[in-house]
Amino acid sequence: MEVHSTRAMAARAVALCEALLWEEPTPGSIAGVLRAHGELGPLELSPDDVSAMRAAAGRLMELFAAPSAGEAAGLLNRLLAGTACPPRLTDHGGTTTWHLHVDRDDDAPWAEWFLASSAMSMAVLLADHQRVPAGLCASAPCGRPFLDTSGGSPRRYCSPRCATRERVAAHRAATRGM
């Protein structure tokens, strides 16, 4: 997958939300997630950067919980109005291929970049698929975010493991009731 594609940026947003909100994030662990999603060059993150990114991830979780495309669109419009700048092309001084950014500049704070680029990628996916592009796992003990760009029915679970756990629990409950 191209690192700067819309889907890749949305997948990175989901992975960062998971790392920031379901784990004990450190600058090193978040840099690892960024590198796993193709970010190159120096990734100088401070504990304050991670804290601000964690707050941004909390705002994205509202989007993932949106019950409808209309509500998600409203949330995305508010996020974009509050964080995005006019689109600009950058190659980060020749270190990457040309791609769009909607943050202030190449030296914008990490949280600004994370929230603006995540909102933009999710907005494009919502427009392309006409539905909320991500969700929260319906398995009660989980609740993790997931990206849903499939063409079929909307996903309910973050993984086959959670889906199977829920099906087995429902089967056992139904069997006990017989």
Label every model-predicted segment.
Residues M1-D148:
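Short helix-coil boundary/hinge micro-motifs
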Residues P133-G135, P154, E166:
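A structural preference for long, well-packed, hydrophobic secondary-structure segments
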Residues D148, T164, V168:
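Short, non-ligating residues that shape and space the ligands of small metal-coordination modules
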Residues G151-S153, A173:
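Short, glycine/charged-enriched secondary-structure capping and boundary segments
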Residues S153-A163:
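Cysteine-rich micro-motifs
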Residues A169-M178:
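Contiguous alpha-helical segments
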